């Protein structure tokens, strides 16, 4: 599967890496020795979809800590971790709590470190494109909050550049700022469709979280991050040269 680009546009890597190891951080035996012979660790591990067996704590904290423990044991020279932007505005969200617990562990580890905080990925906005293709998008809230998401390749360069320098946190956004509603409209235009967006009040989404939590706590925890993030702006310092409009156009070309 590493010989072809991934579903979010990530490049094939089979011919540019020395070794590929597949493991499960919730099964420690599968990642034993993962940092042996490694100088620098780049870690972007996180739970992004519902899992019936594992929580954000299991993956975002414990899973990352298992990698960190081995990095400490192997005396790696630097540990680069990709976390979340605006974490201070969402401290009670389970996903954020787990990521930030790990950030605390990293800072206490005595390893040289950097924490990268992207505000949103083009691949996240790609979900709007998928919905726009169906001809209709449900939008939670008024869609007036702003974001400047970043392309994965531009974020990768920020991570590599963070190898040198002091221990620090780096907030990262892309070159273009849109409201959430504007990103949806951009997706519709890329599909060649007239925007059809139905607004759902925030109270309805929050009520849905409560009901969902009665049946599926893990799903509700992940959804709570998505809902909470729609309540404020996510504008971070601009990095990179790739534009969301072009990303949507590329998705449209593939679909055709």
Residue ranges and their predicted role:
Residues 146-153, 172-190, 203-209, 242:
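Substrate-binding strand-loop-helix patch
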Residues 41, 155, 159, 172, ...:
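Non-catalytic, hydrophobic alpha-helical segments
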Residues 229-256:
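Amphipathic terminal alpha-helices
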Residues 182-231:
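Terminal hydrophobic/aromatic helix or amphipathic segment near a protein terminus
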Residues 47-133:
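Glycine-/Pro-rich loop/turn segments that contact NAD(P) or position catalytic residues
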Residues 5-66, 70-73, 88:
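NAD(P)H-binding glycine-rich loop region in Rossmannoid oxidoreductase-like domains
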Residues 123-130, 161-170, 193-195:
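Glycine/proline-rich active-site loop of Rossmann-fold NAD(P)-dependent oxidoreductases
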Residues 63, 140-163, 168:
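Substrate-positioning beta->alpha
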